[in-house]
Amino acid sequence: MKVVSSIGSLKNRSKDCQIVKRRGRIYVICKTDPRLKVRQGGAKMKRK
């Protein structure tokens, strides 16, 4: 799975791609071609 800063253009790669929001992150999942999986949203800042 790739991590990108913007998934605007990646959501239209295939007609089977879906946008899913889980735990504050946005995912693009594709069941027909799993290579197209993408996640947006980086690591959260940890407190010391």
From Swiss-Prot:
Keyword terms of this UniProt record: Chloroplast, Plastid, Ribonucleoprotein, Ribosomal protein
GO molecular function terms attached to this record: structural constituent of ribosome
Family (UniProt): Belongs to the bacterial ribosomal protein bL36 family.
GO CC aspect terms: chloroplast; ribonucleoprotein complex; ribosome
GO biological process, one term: translation
Keyword Phosphoprotein: no
Places the protein is found: Plastid, Chloroplast
Protein name (database record): Large ribosomal subunit protein bL36c
